[in-house]
Amino acid sequence: MRKVKFFLFVITVCALFASCDKMTNNGNLDGMWQLISVSYNKTGGEDSIVNVKNERVYMNFQQKLGQITPGTFRTDSMGRYLLMRFEKKSGLLKLHDFYAFYETAGPLGTERHSEEKLLTDSATTLLQPFGIDGLFANFNILKLTGSSMILQSDYAKLVMRKF
């Protein structure tokens, strides 16, 4: 009987260590990032640099899902926050499939309803404050450490710090 209990204990411990743990290949990208500045690329002129540190814009990356918390740039058409899919491969970060997440309260705040809407208008300017022109973005990862990240696309350069 004692051997059976010990065997069951060993099996239980092994199952606990082997279950429900997903590892990502995102490295330092995973986590919450604060957008510090956006430099919009100008053709034939100087880049326009916008300091957005005090606007409370955050980007979160986990597994293959990203989230943008718009801070003071929030509008009704944007919703509470934006969700997106992303792919990170060999120095390139691709952002796509953006969703606006809406949350409304019922009478006297008793019920909460949430809804996600896929952004489909290819001419949207909704994402431009975050350095994204249109419905997708391809960023070259210029720098990615445990504390800072710099992304560069044809449209903008983003400087972020780990939060």
Map each language-model feature to its residues:
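C-terminal motif of bacterial Sec signal peptides marking the signal peptidase cleavage site
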Residues: 16-19
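Signal peptide cleavage region of secreted peptide precursors
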Residues: 21-24
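Transition segment at domain starts
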Residues: 35-38, 48-61
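C-terminal/domain-terminus segments
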Residues: 85-87, 151-163
